[in-house]
Swiss-Prot record:
Protein family per UniProt: Belongs to the peptidase S1 family.
Species in which this protein is naturally found: Bos taurus (Bovine)
Domain remarks in the Swiss-Prot or TrEMBL record: The beta chain mediates most of the interactions with both subunits of hemoglobin, while the alpha chain forms the homodimeric interface.
CDD domains, per the entry: CCP (cd00033), Tryp_SPc (cd00190)
Protein name: Haptoglobin
GO biological process: acute-phase response; defense response to bacterium; immune system process; Notch signaling pathway; zymogen activation
Length: 401
């Protein structure tokens, strides 16, 4: 007959004895267990957490062995009690039942994208169901066009004002081959708009997009370097000076980094004012070390065309731009004039957005992307690609890539 193995577990013995006798519990409070033939006594203790706390690891049971307290799961390591965030069983009511609900909420600077309200009910089939979208889980998307510190006054990137508050969190700096600086505009967590000319800076016109990608360095927020995965040029970029940049990873959205919203209506009206930020050259023709911005008005397109091309010029005309370079002017572009302080954009600002504030929804939208940044307060107009004219291409490109 095999020997009988006995294990005696003493649970909270000291506490129980102290209650019964009214004396203070000590290490010797527990009496020795009676011995029986062909056995040995093994002592164990169980740690228990206070109400609303639970053990972080192990089952709390420790056996005394070779003068050491050992837990089978975590050895000599002592357990820890952490806050128990599980819901206790609710009390029952007469003629009623308990329905379990959960609500999904997004982190700051994110919002629910789906039409549901984030509330899910646990049904009899053990499924979490939302009344609007069923079993489909909600998605949190980045908030756009809601800077924590928006521009709140008319200030004066030729001269311009410093963006000390972070009013333009969608502004990115692009450094291309030969350390040439230009702008780019964040439009979601992973994509940016810039100009095709910017992407070709330092490259010959026959370069492929895949060859341009590894030469780019891109910075968002407070000089946060992000890795570029690919660039996509507009199929007609000789007439539509636009390209897209895809990042290898999504950027976390916060008060320093936030996309600008794409417009659902046309904000380009003569006289409408908007803001442009950038890292381009200043009044001394040096690249600025700090992000600057300027407020500029939408200009009359016909006057802008005449300014650059000359009145009644023949079709085979040569460029008459005051700066010796002809901008792209067509149905996909619009012109912006100088500020009342004669401030302007300049070399290096291209790719930045002309943003407008919609008071109805208190949101900022990208109305245009600066294409011609060579006016530098010498010419009267800067030229921008109209964002509404490229929306379909932008959406299809993002969806397919």
């Amino acid at each position: 007959m095999s020997a009988l193995q006995a294990v005696v577990t003493l649970l909270l013995c000291g506490q129980l004895l102290a209650v019964e006798t009214g004396s203070e519990a000590t290490a010797d409070s527990c009496p020795k267990a009676p011995e029986i033939a062909n056995s040995h006594v093994e002592y164990s203790v169980r740690y228990q957490c206070d109400k609303y706390y639970k053990l972080h690891a192990g089952n709390g049971v420790y056996t005394f062995n070779n003068k050491q307290w050992i837990n089978k799961d975590i050895g000599q390591q002592l357990p820890e009690c952490e806050e128990d965030d599980s819901c206790p069983e609710p009390p029952k009511i007469e003629n009623g039942y308990v329905e379990y609900l959960v609500r999904y909420q997004c982190k700051p600077y994110y919002t629910l994208r789906t039409c549901g309200d984030g509330v899910y009910t646990f049904n009899s089939k053990k499924q979490w169901i939302n009344k609007n979208i069923g079993q489909k889980l909600p998605e949190c998307e980045a908030v756009c066009g809601k800077p924590k510190h928006p521009v709140d006054q008319v200030q004066r990137i030729i001269g311009g004002s410093l963006d000390a508050k972070g009013s333009f969190p969608w502004q990115a700096k692009m450094v291309s081959q030969h350390n040439l600086i230009s702008g780019a505009t964040l439009i979601n967590e992973r994509w940016l708009l810039t100009t095709a000319k910017n992407l070709y800076l330092g490259h010959s016109s026959d370069k492929k997009a895949k060859d341009i990608t590894p030469t780019l360095r891109l910075y968002v927020g407070k000089n946060q370097l992000v890795e570029v995965e690919k660039v996509v040029l507009h199929p007609d970029h000789s007439k539509v000076d636009i390209g897209l940049i895809k990042l290898r990873q999504k950027v976390p959205v916060n008060d320093k980094v936030m996309p600008i919203c794409l417009p659902s209506k046309d904000y380009v009206k003569v006289g409408r004012v908007g803001y442009v930020s950038g890292w381009g050259r200043n009044e001394n023709f040096n690249f600025t070390e700090h992000l600057k911005y300027v407020m500029l008005p939408v200009a009359d397109q016909d006057k802008c065309v005449k300014h650059y091309e000359g009145v009644d010029a023949p079709k085979n005309k040569t460029a008459k731009s005051p700066v010796g370079v002809q901008p792209i002017l067509n149905e996909n572009t619009f012109c912006v004039g100088l500020s009342k302080y004669q401030d302007d954009t300049c070399y290096g600002d291209a790719g930045s957005a002309f943003v407008v504030h919609d008071k109805e929804d208190d949101t900022w939208y990208a109305a245009g992307i600066l294409s011609f940044d060579k006016s530098c307060a010498v010419a009267e107009y800067g030229v921008y690609v109209k964002v509404t004219s490229i929306l379909d291409w932008v959406r299809k490109t993002i969806a397919n890539n």
